[in-house]
Amino acid sequence: MTAPSLVVHSEPQCLTLRDAIATPFELVAPADAPEQAPRHASFKAYTRGCLYDSDGARVDLSVRVGGVGGDQAASLDPAILPPEQRGGSWLTGRALYLGPCMNHYGHFITEGLSRYWKQDIGPVDHVVGYPFMHNNGNIQIEAFHRHLASLLDVPIDRMAILRSQTVFDEIVVPEQLWATNVHVNAHMRTVYERIRARHAGRKSSGRLFLSRAASKRLGNPLAVEEAFASFGFRVIHPERVPIAEQLALYANCEVLASLSGSGMHNCLFARPGLMTIEVGDTRARRNPVLTQRMAHELAQVEAHFIPFGEGTEADIEPKIVRKNLRKILSELPRRGPVLMLRLKRRFGGLGGGKAQKRG
């Protein structure tokens, strides 16, 4: 039986509002919202803060609803803003609304970028957005935010954070095209293609395996790295590689593999039809999580998954990884690249570097 599609094909919406009201951002602990139905164990916070039109009606296009599946946050914004709560500091001119700003890389390249699709907005005087639950509601703009936003002509460094009630002379509100654990709009392919096109066409970056030095959900990433190295994969720790170099690697690779999580989301920047290989962990034991399945379908990649298994330990069996790779790649492992990897670790060389030659 074919699973329902996670990609929708509706025409994206974009509203232009006059005299709209932005309520201030607020984090609400689950214990402080007892009227809400119980959530799953990893749920962290409710949020308040969205736009209302001049009549006090909530602008649903401005809301990150959340709370679906394993999502860790959900909105508490009421449908109507009472008359006595309307008003606020007036912001003259034209503003662009970006919704919640995601500090976390994986959230930013999925739902965060999904309000950056509108290309014909015209000049704006202000860029505004909300914080999110990460880092206790504080915004941390990093190099990857700046680079990706600049490729899409969005001046993120000008973004003002909505922490006090504000009334807008005029505000443009693009729809959020990625609804976490619900669906993603096919128009997002255009966003990722615009990014990929700026980095594609260079020399092949070969087979890539994206890893990390430590993981709460996988106890033996070094052993997994060696399994992939034995099949000719370059082991890369993305946090050590500048974002522009990362995007060039993803746009020009032959196979993209990763531990489960944000690294695997980078398939969105790769070419359609690319083979991807994900290694499961204690969260994604049998299948990719829903966000990753959305990314796979949107990116139109040939996705493979190595199950973690049902054991109580946090380690995955390296022999299981190698067995799966033999089956997926139809080839045998080699010892030489593993020895090279160990030397690179010793001398701190797990950044971008040069592609390995296949022998």
Please give the residue ranges for each predicted region:
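The feature primarily captures lumenal catalytic ectodomains
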Residues: M1-G359
